[in-house]
């Protein structure tokens, strides 16, 4: 069959390869027309079909006693007990946010919310994981301002609280920021709305906004590297309307309660093409779509434009015959467009009509189920660059003493730097510093169910208040905790260990608020898998995620893969991001009374370290290290070394012990040791509480910078009332008896009423800093780099 288009040019435009075209022709038994080729282009993109990553994802654990819905639907669903279920998922909007940060981030929020309420759940919380280049570059400042404003605008207007997240900075993200949005939704019914069409002849209803030319080919755009020419792809960035989405949420939840909706699918990536093909393929049926009935925003739209538009706030329903009119009236009352645009077919095809003519007809499974897989060879050894970094040893660092470090003359800090100065430098690192400038723009109290606000605890906590208005706030005892985590520097240096650490830290943060970890949603942000290094990073990270999720019994319920996150520089070189597998994890809080924050509560409380103890010998415990640490990068300008070993057994022991201790009322505050190690964690607790601390390090021949700033080791800082000292020691001894050979506690010091942080060793002062200096450094790091007024940042 001859075609009326330039095949080579069309393939380039759609991001398809010649062998893809040959396969399409084989499946259709003919050459595709230009509309059909566009449909294949978006549906066979990495963004939609995971053609490079699908074999790796199959290793993830996906089942468990609480899992109601796993991968394959719009969102995962877990059983919370007491007649409540939680829908949750994370998605990326990286490439759109790089070009139009406000709309890219805003529509990312809108899209993840639709995934949640399409399942029949009411959205109750949002989180986000963001990555930017250094704020010394004005372009990165502009990107960050736009992204944060977009997230705030959409979340605040739609009435869903943004309760947590993480923000990190690295030069690898300068041309390609990451914007990952996570949402949670509460369900109180057994009726989970799925997306598979059923009922031959059942009507298909279009609901929501009109269809325009915005977002054209967004799925293909999201599956390619960014270049200067990408600026021409601004039409691929969608435009959102949070007020319309608010009406869509209410109208859809009402419609679902009626029982008249048999299947639902939001129109996200690939728009009508994706929603029709996925609903048809999952149901084992077909769908006929009449474009003349689709509410259009612009005149003269072609079939290609209708099918590939990613206009926001749109849904597709399959409904029971005879109920379509009452449902459409309901939607119209909410100010939404509603139209019958097609029907369910027995024939397993997506058939598209315009002006009575068939403009496209493709087997549904060819678009949404039986899609191609690109297989890559996994190299057996790490890349040479990484092998060289693994050879690094701590003894290569400058000599340390009680007063600090003797640096070489080429250091930008001069020849010497004290421990006080080092701690302040770390607190001034934007990745470690307070994110108050970010989260104060988010409404985290809307819906009045937020228990732990951003910056207060290691994980967000939201009250599980009944949606039907039964019971007062005070009567609600249970909550759900959520967190997003990824140590991207560790993943860059060792993808398997780094990914394991991401899961471990997410679970540890949930445990720090007293929550039982339940399940995971993941967002795999990686560069191109078509290079040996890129695929090695992706494959080993998936291996690490799988191993850790199995150990923690936290199944993966779904997520997102975002590849080709890299920038082609002016000189033609490729700048890949650090591989960033973001782990979103949810947990159940059985009693909100016991929720812990980071802040000390009372002077005199005892400070204990759980996890691998501080070294008392020169021998280096491989579970705690300066390799890959914030200290190494911030102070010495090095991103090197092999990150610490991840002791998953110890993680489980420590976290279980912590949760039990919180439940029993022993632990008053809890904060995990992460970026910056012990000294930074103690400083953060002091800043949060406005109380001081005196930490006495044990006598040791180990390097002092290792004692103060090393990372890893499943470590958590807790405070215990002094009145409970004897009982607490009994609990610790009992835990050691239960798990012989695992020493995982160490007394460090005491909370003080003094306005300073004091760290000593054998009576020698190492760190002595007033709280106001710590706080000023911590709170002003980001606003100062952005050139903002500092008077309101503390």
From Swiss-Prot:
Gene Ontology terms, cellular component aspect?
cytoplasm
Q: Which reaction does it catalyse?
A: N(2)-formyl-N(1)-(5-phospho-beta-D-ribosyl)glycinamide + L-glutamine + ATP + H2O = 2-formamido-N(1)-(5-O-phospho-beta-D-ribosyl)acetamidine + L-glutamate + ADP + phosphate + H(+)
| InterPro entries hit by this protein | PRibForGlyAmidine_synth_PurL, PurL_linker, PurM-like_C_dom, PurM-like_C_sf, PurM-like_N, PurM-like_N_sf
What is the active site of this protein? Answer: 47, 93
**Cell location:** Cytoplasm
**Primary site of residence:** cytoplasm
Q: Which UniProt keywords apply?
A: ATP-binding, Cytoplasm, Ligase, Magnesium, Metal-binding, Nucleotide-binding, Purine biosynthesis
GO MF terms, alphabetically ordered: ATP binding; magnesium ion binding; phosphoribosylformylglycinamidine synthase activity
Ligand binding (ATP): 50, 89, 522, 559
Q: Which residues does the record give as Mg(2+) 1 binding sites?
A: 91, 560
Q: Which residues bind Mg(2+) 2?
A: 115, 266
Share an example GO biological-process annotation for this protein.
'de novo' IMP biosynthetic process
So what EC number does this one have?
6.3.5.3
- Residues that bind substrate: 92-95, 114, 238, 310-312, 562
The yes or no answer to whether the keyword Mitochondrion is present is no
To which pathway does this protein belong?
Purine metabolism; IMP biosynthesis via de novo pathway; 5-amino-1-(5-phospho-D-ribosyl)imidazole from N(2)-formyl-N(1)-(5-phospho-D-ribosyl)glycinamide: step 1/2
First-tier enzyme category under EC = ligase
Q: Tell me, how does this one assemble?
A: Monomer. Part of the FGAM synthase complex composed of 1 PurL, 1 PurQ and 2 PurS subunits.
What does the UniProt function comment say about this protein?
Part of the phosphoribosylformylglycinamidine synthase complex involved in the purines biosynthetic pathway. Catalyzes the ATP-dependent conversion of formylglycinamide ribonucleotide (FGAR) and glutamine to yield formylglycinamidine ribonucleotide (FGAM) and glutamate. The FGAM synthase complex is composed of three subunits. PurQ produces an ammonia molecule by converting glutamine to glutamate. PurL transfers the ammonia molecule to FGAR to form FGAM in an ATP-dependent manner.
User: What family does the Swiss-Prot or TrEMBL record give for this protein?
Assistant: Belongs to the FGAMS family.
- From the Swiss-Prot or TrEMBL record, give the protein name: Phosphoribosylformylglycinamidine synthase subunit PurL
